[in-house]
Amino acid sequence: MAANPKKQLALDTNLLLDLAEERDWAQDFREEFQTRGYTLRIGPTVVVELEWLSSSGEEPQRTYAGRAAERVSTWRITPFELSALDQTVAERFADALLDHSLIPVDEFNDGLILAETSLAAIPLLVTSDKHLLDIDETALKLAFNDADLLPVSPVHPRRLLRALR
């Protein structure tokens, strides 16, 4: 049985590192939304970034990435996969974000993560990444529209927690 996309949230790598660092607001977010029946998901690029950081990143990120990789299943965070065609679509979308200066040149993976989240039909990407949170919302929606992809909104976990109150 497929998960209901309205009850799914995608997480980016930064949030996994925040969880591994045991930041209270990250733990509160995970626990609260899972209690409310949300499925927390990570895409292929997040998995690759986590693997790379845990083996090649600088400290303390390497330690946190290793811890996150070990705890993903304990935290009940599930990866999703995409087809080769979907991966190509994600790469083209990330290129378009770069072309429109919506993400910095060294943040190509942020574009991939946004596209992968869209292709998985998950409407929100939960992140603490300033690059993602600072993207012009209207320009991002237009970019999704131009690519014929479902829009995804990057949102900080604290903002989601506040929305519950």
Residue ranges and their predicted role:
Residues 1-6, 11, 23, 42, ...:
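Acidic, PIN/NYN-like endoribonuclease modules and their adjacent C-terminal/linker elements
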Residues 31-34, 67-74, 143-149:
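Short, conserved catalytic or adaptor-binding loops enriched in Gly and charged residues
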Residues 48-50, 82-90, 157-165:
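A short acidic, often aromatic-flanked loop/helix-cap motif at beta-alpha or helix-coil junctions
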Residues 54-63, 100-106, 134-139:
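Short, flexible/disordered intra-domain loops and linkers
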Residues 63-84:
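Low-complexity, serine/threonine/proline-enriched polar segments
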Residues 77-124, 130-134:
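Active-site neighborhoods of divalent-metal-dependent phosphate/nucleic-acid chemistry enzymes
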